[in-house]
Structures are given as structure tokens and as C-alpha cells.
Amino acid sequence: MAHRELAWTCEDGTRMHGCVWHPEQRSNIGGVVGLVHGMGEHMGRYVHVAQMLNEAGYAVIGFDQRGHGRTEGKRGHAPTYEALMEGVDRLLTEAASGYPGVPVFLLAHSMGGNVALNYLLRKQPDIAGAIVTGPWLKLAFKPPSLQVAIGRIVERIYPSYTNDRPLKAANLTTDPEMIQRYLNDPLGHGQITAKFFFSMLRAGRWAIEHANELRVPTLMMHATEDRVTSSVASKQFADNAGPLCEWIGWDGFRHELMNELRREEVFDTIRRWLDGRLAR
């Protein structure tokens, strides 16, 4: 597996950090997959996913979103929701230019799934397909009403106010090794600003309401026991989207399907779905 890093500067001066992984023999590349990570994450958490895809003949390109990993900016914050979608747009541009003539896919998780789905619906990109795991369309729990009401006021008067509340590692996976990696990760964080949080809530609702406008073949997978994001909401999205969106529920799994003990089953499903799209 060959690896290189890339970087670019956004119009507002924010320096973005990305990574590319591809098979040693570039002639063996059948497709390129753009990775979009979740809240508090970074591309370093997806090396094993990139390796799996490389071994299956897919190049992989990903980037640390604004306020995450080695990309600049206040942790857990973005100036606008549009700025997050611009990151996905740049990701797909890099994928297409780096591997001309090769089918391009998206693979997005959690918060990244929210952004990716909104990008698919609002921008209607010409790509071969998308895979979304555990998308944050709605939370799996209901925050206290008073806390939400205060948060909405804070969003208006102090949008960059930060709440530091890391996710419980045990809610992410049942794999002890992956839990330890998560806890020891120096680039991971649990920070999110008021503006970022409510932007996600609004975008999630919008995506569900407009799911029937989906034009890109999509595989959506969710842990049925997810304690972070709502599997009911992602199933609702898939139902609204119609036959173009296939939904798979994973019993006995937690939020991070690709970090679970039985992740090889998930990887197998991903590979078969991607290969199936290439065969069409």
C-alpha cells in the first residue's frame, strides 16, 4: 500500500490536510473512494479501511474536516455548513483529477454521513455511488429540552461556544483494542460548537425530507443498537429515497461498524457493493 499526504488552502485561508492511499500497482486500480470521517475524528483512524480497499483494488483519498485532525481551525467548528460541503467537493475533485477515467465513490461515516448525504442531494454530483455508515441524521437519544433551548440562544449570540463532551468509547465499538486506540488518540477530540451542532440537526432533518431527490446509488448501513446516531432516522431516509438507496441494519453492532469485532463482515459487504457498481 502506497501512501502520500496532500494539503490545500481554502478561500478563507484554512489549511486542509489530506491523505491518499493506493495499491502499489496503479494499473490495478478499478475505482477511487473518497473518505469523509465523523465527529472528533481524522483520517488516521481509517488506515485499516484504506488498506482493505487497496487490497480490493480501490485507491482511497480522504481529508481531515475543518476543526479536526491536522486541518486548521477551532476544534469542532466550521464557519458555515456550506464550508463542510466544499470540503467534500474538493475531495471529489482531487479523486477525479488524481485518477482520471476511474469511477469515483464516497464512503462517509456519522457526521461525515450527514455532510455527504446533503452534498449528494444539494449538489447532485456525477459519481458512481456512495456508502454511508451510521449517519448523523438524528441522534439516538433526546437531549434535555432545557439544554437545547439554551443552546439555541447560545448559537445566536456566541456561535463558536464550545461544548467538550467526548463520546463514550463503549458506545462506539465492542472491540477492546479499538476502544483503547480511541482513548489514546492525541488527535481525537469531543469538542463541538453551538453553531456546528445545530447546523447538523437542521441538515439532518433537511436530508430526510428531501431524500426522494437522491440521484446517486447509495448503500446505507447502520448498527441497530447504535447509541449515538439514530438507525430509525437512516431507515426513514432510505425509505424516502426509494430503490436507489439500499439500507442494511447490523444487529449486535455499535456505532462504528468498521471498527467492530466483526468488521470483516462489514468490509465484505462494502467490497461486494463497490464491485457490483463497477460491473454495471
Question: Where are the regions a protein language model picked out?
Answer:
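N-terminal cap/lid segment of alpha/beta-hydrolase-fold proteins
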Residues: 1-25
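Catalytic active-site module of serine/aspartate enzymes centered on a nucleophile-bearing elbow/loop
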Residues: 244-280
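Short alpha-helix in the alpha/beta-hydrolase fold that links the catalytic acid
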Residues: 216, 230-240
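Conserved alpha/beta-hydrolase
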Residues: 50-73
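Active-site glycine-rich loops that stabilize anionic/oxyanionic intermediates
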Residues: 33, 38-41
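Catalytic nucleophile-loop/oxyanion-hole region of alpha/beta-hydrolase
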Residues: 40-43, 69-99
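Short beta-strand/loop motif that positions the catalytic acidic residue
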Residues: 214, 220-222, 226
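Alpha/beta-hydrolase-fold enzymes
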Residues: 109-193
